[in-house]
Amino acid sequence: MRYRRRDNGRRRTSGVAGFAALGRVCDGVVMAWIELDGAVNVRDLGDLPTEDGQKTARSRLLRADNLQDLSAADVRKLVHDIGVTTVVDLRSSNELAAEGPAPLDAVAGVRHAHHPVLPEVGSNTDVVADALLARDRMDKFRYPRDPVCGHYLGYLEDRPYQVVGALRSIAHSGGAAVVHCAAGKDRTGVVVALALTVAGVPAEAVVADYAATGERTEAIMARLRRSRLYSRDVNSKPADLQRPRAETMAAFLEQMDARYGGVASWLTDHGLSAADLDALRVRLRAGA
């Protein structure tokens, strides 16, 4: 993968087609899966490469699927072994009300930061990125080549202050922050991609992290099928259509450059201060 530079010096990838060589480009990028009893799509986002030859820090940012079913052993691992102090929950208020309190909610010293990135209407759950028909039409309008990418852009357009709030919560977490939604794919994937880009992780590694969720698709969907809240969304489409596509995240990152001048520009234009941006970058970098 080669990069080209625009006049403003911000990185831009050379096109979605370049991600066909993703596995070769990202040789040596190892996903740090965390095995838990009550969640199946959890990983530490440390040790990812940065553009200046450094790495992201371990035990600073985790991504996950729904944390509702954690066992006592899971809680000990996350809080005592890894040092989680902040849960960044991207689910809707409807989801929170339907699911009830989660095990980490009862742990002293763990802050729950609620940042729903979907409009708070109806029963939006977002297990399947384009499952909601009204939003599906808007998603196709936003980015006809890939409606799921259009759906991701919708988070930025519909709920920018919640997206920014999620990044701010990560930046100022005293210990590790774990970001999650239901499947840990769409909402989580976008917020994590923004955070990693700020930290200087190159686009191909951001895409590799996003696509890694595909390794756990069957387990994620099996888990969600057991939930009354999510089963209808999950059963509405075959598993292959619920897998993350590398091309979708590649397109999203390209659109961030093309439409907004880059991730950092969009964040600062929507209320993330320069101090917050620096805090996020420092927080996620090894050696900080």
Roles of regions detected by a PLM:
Residues 183, 187-188:
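Ser/Thr-glycine-rich phosphate-binding loops at phosphate-binding pockets of nucleotides
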Residues 2-6, 10, 19-178, 190-288:
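Cys-dependent protein tyrosine phosphatase-like superfamily
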